[in-house]
Amino acid sequence: MVFKTIWIERYRKLINLFRALASCHGSNLDVEKPVVFKEDAASFGQTVVQFGGSRLVVGAPLEAVAVNQTGQLYDCAPATGVCQPILLHIPLEAVNMSLGLSLVADTNNSQLLACGPTAQRACAKNMYAKGSCLLLGSSLQFIQAIPATMPECPGQEMDIAFLIDGSGSIDQSDFTQMKDFVKALMGQLASTSTSFSLMQYSNILKTHFTFTEFKSSLSPQSLVDAIVQLQGLTYTASGIQKVVKELFHSKNGARKSAKKILIVITDGQKFRDPLEYRHVIPEAEKAGIIRYAIGVGDAFREPTALQELNTIGSAPSQDHVFKVGNFVALRSIQRQIQEKIFAIEGTESRSSSSFQHEMSQEGFSSALSMDGPVLGAVGSFSWSGGAFLYPSNMRSTFINMSQENEDMRDAYLGYSTALAFWKGVHSLILGAPRHQHTGKVVIFTQESRHWRPKSEVRGTQIGSYFGASLCSVDMDRDGSTDLVLIGVPHYYEHTRGGQVSVCPMPGVRSRWHCGTTLHGEQGHPWGRFGAALTVLGDVNGDSLADVAIGAPGEEENRGAVYIFHGASRQDIAPSPSQRVTGSQLFLRLQYFGQSLSGGQDLTQDGLVDLAVGAQGHVLLLRSLPLLKVGISIRFAPSEVAKTVYQCWGRTPTVLEAGEATVCLTVRKGSPDLLGDVQSSVRYDLALDPGRLISRAIFDETKNCTLTRRKTLGLGDHCETMKLLLPDCVEDAVTPIILRLNLSLAGDSAPSRNLRPVLAVGSQDHVTASFPFEKNCKQELLCEGNLGVSFNFSGLQVLEVGSSPELTVTVTVWNEGEDSYGTLIKFYYPAELSYRRVTRAQQPHPYPLRLACEAEPTGQESLRSSSCSINHPIFREGAKATFMITFDVSYKAFLGDRLLLRASASSENNKPETSKTAFQLELPVKYTVYTVISRQEDSTKHFNFSSSHGERQKEAEHRYRVNNLSPLTLAISVNFWVPILLNGVAVWDVTLRSPAQGVSCVSQREPPQHSDLLTQIQGRSVLDCAIADCLHLRCDIPSLGTLDELDFILKGNLSFGWISQTLQKKVLLLSEAEITFNTSVYSQLPGQEAFLRAQVSTMLEEYVVYEPVFLMVFSSVGGLLLLALITVALYKLGFFKRQYKEMLDLPSADPDPAGQADSNHETPPHLTS
């Protein structure tokens, strides 16, 4: 229990905190102390209406007041919080009317209309719901019922044909009894909508009167009296066929829309009839004829006779077949037949019409127009719906789309009702939420005393109930309707349910369309937002009407109410200004927001109130008083003096900048009866808000912020505070900003408990500027004198490709007065891009502040960058040096010279001079990376012999040229090849070059040295130093990136010249070199060696010997060597046999057993 008490207390504190925060943010309804009305009556709060400026009328339509009487109205007094039931004279015929299901008051509070659309009336066995309303006066006294009386029971059109048996089996007296029965039944069923006809049958079929003759007869009873019995056989089936084909025909007065009823009276089975029932009865069924069969006498005790009687009557037989013992007993079944026939009234058949107004439920919605009460009749014409207008003469006018409009079937037109006055024309607006399952709203106007549809707008989502609620709004209170709110409470989205469409009134010839759509809070898919709508009045002081919208299904049916402010004459603000929930007021409140009524001052405080219905409760929420606050700030002096903020070069001290005076003017934002209103005001002051470091501070707080809390009444309230400068000011161009943010927490007014809030248009923040005095001879105009120059930081040539950056050293100076917004702009080719800026390592009397950025120029070939210098002020006599660096693309093409321009400007608007513009050019080269290399498949070695007369062989030297640079360039490839040595041919060479675009020329060049033997000693190399050479030059005008070209030096290499060198081995050397325009290109640094290449071929001479002499000499030598070896071996005893002697010698090794084997035998092949 203690825990529960603590939890409730915390909950209350949390609610109060939320209420205080809501008040600070401009809520317009008081939720702290609402006026609460509570009754135990069933459905109390289902409807509510403000009436007479001092009372609430609340409906409880399900309250059982008495037998056959439901619905009660309550008169609730806001001053006491007490409700009293209103005693009314309810018409006796208004059975169970659900009084109060709709409530509406007229605009001048002189009349109130309370309706009960379920008022019932019994007609035979049918219950019709016609509806009924009560018109009440200004004192809630009964004036009249509308309609004045309940309408008579509807008369169903019926064509009733009698087929009576006139055969000879019936006595004359019984035949007379049968005629009396027919006359009595005609009397009971007679009405303006019922017609009769009669045919007698035996074996003769005779029509006594048709429907036409019956209608034209002045005495219908005499038509029956004149009938004479035919006598004869019984042709019952033939009689039925004749009735179907002839009597129920339009030529005899039968009506297509009428129900067709046939009453057959017979005393027995058919006899000798040529027709069978199986041929006749289907024809009657097809014609939609309801058949009643009456059997008279004992004949029908037989099963076959009874079966025939059941065949004549319609199914089921228990409802359509009657048996009596004699003709006198016919009277006993008159009432039964009458009830059976009356029971079919109001039902539909294939040939009958639908309901008209029997189930109209008049008063489902209602309005009080200039012409009289308007009652929505949703059930008229099979729930197509419409509305009844009851003028003073009480001759009602039914307003609908069309009685035969199938498109309106089950549309529920009249489910909601609203009035509009637009362009001098009174209009009626009706909602049809079930039209085509999506709903629509129709505007009706009166033309030539007929109400006709003028404009309509349709819903989009099936089942959304578009048009379930309507509210016409006069936004500017000029008496003319500006827009209509259309509730769509069952519109479904994943996170919220219901919406309201804001639809401005249509033009004369334009279509009606809706603009803004209002939604409730996310998280309530079954919220039914838009179930109730009302005009609240102007609660925020902007002279535009505000509206309240109920969402009774939010928060698990606890409910909520939203307040939306008017945005313009034709629109509502899309976001709510306040949301009041049922749980915020009472923990157990249910369906809060199911009904709404606003626009009147019921609490007599001069402010409009909002009545909100809930289940068993009605709450009156008062609007809060409005205050408008004006704010002004002024400074003294009007500028910060130069002597205060210019302190460079001296020790900084805190100096007084001036004073700021803040004035608040508090006045009422709307008229009320609350007298003087106190308000708790808090305002926060901030100096230089948004700056990292503020240039000024408050003397009181020694920082840049100051907060004040005061309780103020109506009038002017001022305060002055001192401002200080804590440091030297760099930015003396932009004024010091003082911003004030104000919040209002109004104190409760005496005896009213209402806290004022800020009205729309009140100042809750203001910004003021405190400028600096300018350092100028002429006030407001400074004469700066800027100059700019730069150099390329010692760079002589820009080599594109090897120099990725270009650094420019810039000097800027000001020889005049302070320069404001000093800007240096650089213009350079588009191939360069701004990289960074760096301060020079030089002392400055003022801190140097640089900020550079690239800027568009609008030209593809030109780029620009700008640098602000000491923004905002470049002081008098100041000088700044800095380096700006640009990225140079390795693919850049800048021509042969780079042009860089710079200009200095400021906000002083001084014209450009020769010092403010500077330009400089820098030579440009392009770094390339070209390679020439030898190929491995060149001829590397030749062996030759002079004695055999070898004079020449074919040799190849192969070279490959590659362009590894990103540029396409023009180059030349040079080859040097030895071709003569002292007049002797060396190499008859030709050059095979790539075919496309390569042209080659050649020339002969003499040797560099003439002393052949001296130069070749130790080198053994034949090159252009000692031989005549062929110089080949191939020009390549365009060598693309990554292109490669192959060159082949090929020809017959002679050997006759080698003898001049006195060498056995000589290295033949060719050379190649790449050349290009060095004023445009330069080889990549460190890669110069790849511009040259050599290919060598080793030439080696060998001696050839005679083979015969060699063979003879080798043979003789071999034989002599063999003889010498043989003699030597002989002398050494190699050819003597010593084995036998070895056997004869005693064994050197004794027998291991100590004695020789006596039985040992010498092998036979070793004996002598």
From Swiss-Prot:
Keywords: Calcium, Cell adhesion, Disulfide bond, Glycoprotein, Integrin, Magnesium, Membrane, Metal-binding, Receptor, Repeat, Signal, Transmembrane, Transmembrane helix
Cysteine-cysteine disulfides: 76-83, 115-133, 663-718, 776-782, 852-867, 1000-1024, 1029-1034
Extracellular side: 27-1107
Subcellular location: Membrane
GO cellular component term, pick one: integrin complex
Species for this entry: Mus musculus
Stretch forming the signal peptide: 1-26
Protein name: Integrin alpha-D
Residue stretches spanning the membrane: 1108-1128
InterPro entries xref list: FG-GAP, Int_alpha_beta-p, Integrin_alpha, Integrin_alpha_C_CS, Integrin_alpha_Ig-like_1, Integrin_alpha_Ig-like_2, Integrin_alpha_N, Integrin_dom_sf
SUPFAM superfamilies xrefs: Integrin alpha N-terminal domain, Integrin domains, vWA-like
UniProt domain comment: The integrin I-domain (insert) is a VWFA domain. Integrins with I-domains do not undergo protease cleavage.
